[in-house]
Amino acid sequence: NEVLFYFTEDEYKVAAEDTRERLVFLRACDMNAVKRIDQIYLGNGASNDFFYTRTRKKTKFVVVGCTKTFRNCFCVSMGTNKADNYDAAMNIRENEIQLEIRNEDLNVFSGKEIDFDIDYVSKNEFEVDLPEKVDFMYMQNHKMWDEYDTRCIGCGRCNYSCPTCTCFSMQDIHYKENKNMGERRRVWASCQVDGYTNIAGGHSFRVKHGQRMRFKTLHKIHDYKKRFGENMCVGCGRCDDMCPQYISISEAYEKVARAMREKDNEELISEVYEKVVKAMKEKREE
């Protein structure tokens, strides 16, 4: 969480900026996730998020090459096994480290110059069948979500391990010494836990776990894509690793894909049936 500003009875003060620079080492899928987060905080609305912007400007990223896939990764299916929006890249060998420096601020190393291509995986242990398009109204009350009512326990571990989850809530903390003074915090939140969609009057938009799973799943492969042109999920597989109930987001994507194919088949059968009935009717009238 982060403090946004402090307030008194008649004024507020923006929290002091942390001036330290940050160097983040991450994988290609995570670098693609940073791009998604940038879209949310910097390309989503009339203005950039002030607090995210000032932190982002002081952060540099080093992509670590992947020589092999991890068990639950499906980055190849999501098209995120490669990245090019980094400040530096690194390949780790047995007795050496190979570097590519793109940001001159990081050009503090010496060594032999070589041709550099970052390591990346070209095949995961499994492929994910993604839907080409999603009919939200059709999927909204689809029976596939019912199983998650009992399977999901709403712990939120999938969200907290996800590099593209950006939801947050606001908390006003009032000081004991003076109830009219305090601070406003932005706190990372989970759309899967109880209370996230609570509103005044004791109501909640998504009470059942299946409804929350639907929201998360479709946000990753439909809502975000509709706005920004690419899937939000980067296929890192961490949510599958973290889930105590062994719920797989990749399996949820495939269920959506199957449901959409079933819908298309039903529409095709209905269309053919209507044409046959119409042709038979016209023939009788002759």
Where are these regions (language model features)?
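Hydrophobic positions within alpha-helical membrane elements
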Residues: N32-A33, S161, M242
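Hydrophobic/aromatic-rich, well-ordered segments within soluble, folded domains that form packed cores
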Residues: L26, M31, T164-M170
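A generic "binding-loop/recognition-motif" signal
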Residues: D30, C158, C239
